[in-house]
């Protein structure tokens, strides 16, 4: 027999018009999703990866080896480039760092990476996180660790001093955007007692 599949249009997807508020919602949701991904990655980190990258930095093993993996090089270069443009280093970079790629990182990226590894190590053992949108579920013993990871992501955004917002808005509007930054001290964010509810 023949199987016929048909569909019925229930509602039409409405796209936002340039200059409307829908751009704002998309930007906010994108930043929320970024924070969520980074927090989950920090909580569910792979101990071996964190140990390997920490050792590479401590040993200053920055020479290139002939066994480089092209895709790893390309991804490290891309993530470092995005860091330079936005001021925000994603911990996705950890998965691509090894003896053959660590030398691609400049001094600023290495320093940012050290801070990230320090926070991950302070969080302790990896643990499972369940998420729904921007809601995190963890065992009670991990609540402070997840809160610390969340605050750290907000600190990283604040530390960009508006560079990340300008980067995102420039992509959204396909033109150079350069807003000023207020008087927020990123250290105040880091030392905040922000509570996730």
Which ranges hold each PLM region?
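Conserved catalytic core of nucleotide polymerization and phosphodiester-bond processing enzymes
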Residues: 1-197
């Amino acid at each position: 027999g023949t199987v016929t599949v048909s569909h019925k249009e229930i509602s039409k997807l409405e796209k936002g018009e340039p200059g409307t508020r829908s751009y704002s919602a998309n930007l906010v949701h994108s930043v929320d999703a970024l924070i969520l991904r980074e927090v989950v990655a920090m909580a569910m980190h792979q101990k071996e990866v964190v140990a390997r990258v920490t050792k590479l930095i401590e040993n200053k093993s920055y020479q290139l080896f002939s066994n480089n993996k092209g895709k790893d090089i390309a991804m490290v270069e891309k993530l470092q480039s995005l860091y330079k443009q936005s001021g925000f280093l994603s911990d996705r970079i950890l998965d691509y760092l090894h003896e053959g790629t660590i030398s691609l990182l400049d001094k600023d990226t290495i320093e940012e990476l050290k801070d990230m590894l320090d926070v991950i190590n302070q969080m302790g053992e990896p643990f499972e996180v369940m998420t729904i949108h921007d809601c995190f579920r963890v065992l009670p013993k991990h609540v402070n660790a997840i809160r610390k990871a969340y605050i750290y992501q907000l600190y990283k955004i604040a530390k960009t001093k508006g560079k990340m917002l300008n980067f995102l808005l420039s992509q959204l509007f396909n033109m150079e955007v350069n807003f000023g930054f207020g008087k927020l001290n990123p250290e105040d964010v880091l030392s905040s007692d922000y509570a996730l509810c």
